[in-house]
Amino acid sequence: MGAGQSTGGLESPSTPEQLSVLLAERFATKCFTPLELTHFKDNFYSRALDQAGFRYWNEKILSDFLSIPDGIYTNEKDGGHDGRLDAGPVIFRMVSYLGAFPFQKTLAPSVLTFDAMVKVVVLLTERYGKVLRRGRKDRVKLLFGSLADVGRPVRQEEHNDEGSSSTKTEEAKQSSSHAQGFSVDVSVNDEYDEYEDDDDLALAALESLDAIEVFKHDQRIDGAVYEARISVDTFRRLLMLLLAIAPLKPLESVTKYTFNLSSEEQAAVKREADTIIASFTEEEIRDGIRYKSFAKTVSISLPHLFDPLTPLFEHLLFSKNLDLSRKQTGASNASPESHPPIQTPINEEEQPTTIMLPGSFESAILTPSLVSHLSFFLPASSGQNLYRSDIRLHPVFSTVAHGESLTSFQHNVFTWQAPSILIVQGAAPGSSGTPDELITLGAYIPQPWKPSSSSWETSQSLNDKSRLPYLFQIHPKHSVLPGNPSLLSTREQSSATTPTVYFSTTTGIAIGCEIPASAQQQRTHYGPGVPSPREHLQHHRQSSGGNSIHKQQQQGPIPHGAGSLIIDSGLETAQLHISYLTGSTGVFTRAVPPILPTTTHIDIYNLEIWGIIEPDPLIAAVGGDTISRDAISQQRAAWQFDAREAERRKCINVKLGSGTDSEYQNARALLEMAGIIGDQAHQRSGGSV
């Protein structure tokens, strides 16, 4: 952005190179504040290489500045990281592609000049809205292109007829035409349409410059001849980096997330990355990930996957070289020797950020890597991920700490008046329970658990997807079932029989199931926790040995819609039911990716409920912490009330009539029916959310 790069004059720019520079200038002036731009220039020019007046960054400078492990340049003394976390080449590849925006097909890979880096930061931090007003806030296609290898597809007939030796020869030929360190996947034509879903960002950029014709010229690459795929090795390296830095906050040190990881932490990060990769087909894992599959998986089941790149590249907007207490001149024109790169020291005592609050138990399921995995798709009221919305997770219930009693479950969970996450971990019946055989699944419950039937609340914004439930599987393969949007727009007539969550001491926990009318009628008109006369009669006769009448079976929850989860009353087994034939009915929409079996049976090893504490924007602005913990204080108040009520019940004296045993039993039965004393005072018949 100097005199040599000026595009001013009577003639408007007409070449891709000139238009690219002009777009960078607009990005710089409209997407950054003057202070941010000053810091950006200092960071770039103080580290840039100089070749005959041409200033640029190479891969080593980029990796060192961002504190990203790079196996090519990282010294052994900086070790303590897994080689598979060496994402430096992947990030450099992405940046070189994005720096050529919007002419990636003719100018990529670009040299990392200041103009190129401006476009990179704007695109990866999603600041382009001020310039590209018609640009859709969707970078999926652009990011796919930055990761994908482009090669000439093998025809189906040749793919089937030729032997493995000829295939290897073709692979070797194509590999020689690409950058070292990245494999090019040779694959059959997957009907990838180069022009499908036009790149809205690129079109908006060229429309703002009145240069659509130049853009069309740039697009004249035969989409029928060339196809693009992301190699699994490239995608795995990026996934491991994103999982490691998911908790990263703006201007927070990156090194505490990317270096000095223990072997257990490295294994945990790799495991989460592998579960995401396992969600693609075997053919894609072998030959490369297609755009259609990548776009659908990321957009629906991993909408926040690339969020960690925003705070990572925002480091370029703050320079430690600048001392704002005094004026500095010529900072942007200084030589590399005058401003050597400042190495960020690793603070051994500094711990990575965690959103898990201390409480009554430590999780046997959640690890930092698994929480990072959850942050890639779970919603938050702010529209951002779990980390960027400042959400905290409070331990509510654990079978390890509180036992497998539904009474204990009610005591801890039904008193939590905020959204929650249910996490179940186990293995298929008969398996040995090794880490590779573990199955981890769960549900996001946006409403507090309630002891009585209630319809869906629609007071929130109709576009607030954080108020939709989610059903998901984490291990061994990633798959998500988002909540049905109709839950926000209408009050479904079936809400009474298809609640999001149904709880019963008889049948257990049901999520997304249809509840038979007979089960609903037994508690419809008697209020929360108050058993109907029929229930009380059955309970009384069962305790008296009248099992013949009690054998009248109560029909349990019925799987309904695209997905349902049923947990038995002993919290010992769970069943995940998936349907790919259902329409728009049910609590959840179809699983994405569609790789789950129709029925999954697991023996439960651990079950945990984690409460979600969302920051109150009004209180947060004042700086207080009272409201953010209000759900915790409400739960404690409920426990104290229950304790007082239990003491009060102990003091109730039943004195009616002459005080005979018969009259005493009748009076006591009446109080039990009212839910005031006895087991029913603590064991409510059921409830739903």
Curated annotation (Swiss-Prot):
Residues 364-613 form the TLDc domain. One of its GO terms (cellular component) is cytoplasm. It comes from the Eukaryota. Residues 543-556 have a biased composition (Polar residues). Disulfide bonds: none annotated. Residues 154-173 have a biased composition (Basic and acidic residues). May be involved in a process influencing telomere capping. This is Restriction of telomere capping protein 5. It comes from Talaromyces marneffei (strain ATCC 18224 / CBS 334.59 / QM 7333).
